[in-house]
Amino acid sequence: MKKYPISHYKKSGSSLFVNGGTLTVTDSECLVEYLNKEVVRFSLWDTVVTKASSELLYEGIRLTHDGQSIDLYFPKMGKTIRELREHFHMTD
């Protein structure tokens, strides 16, 4: 299990900006916790495309929720996980 420190959560519209708490990555899922409370849990497949992208979980990632699914935006790459999956030709 890998844990990535994040500094604070704040909501802005439908986006959750992750700046605090802990993002835990297991073999099957990711869990974001803040103040020991589960904030959001989602499939690892939707979150980490490659080892390279998993290493980019750092302050500034943005979690977005469209009502059905959650996506992560990586500022350094300027792409979301969905875009990365499309780039690597990965499908559901």
What are these regions (language model features)?
Residues 1-23, 83:
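Anionic N-terminal interaction surfaces
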Residues 2, 39-92:
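Acidic, Ser/Thr- and proline-rich intrinsically disordered linker/docking segments
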Residues 9, 33-35, 64:
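A generic structural motif
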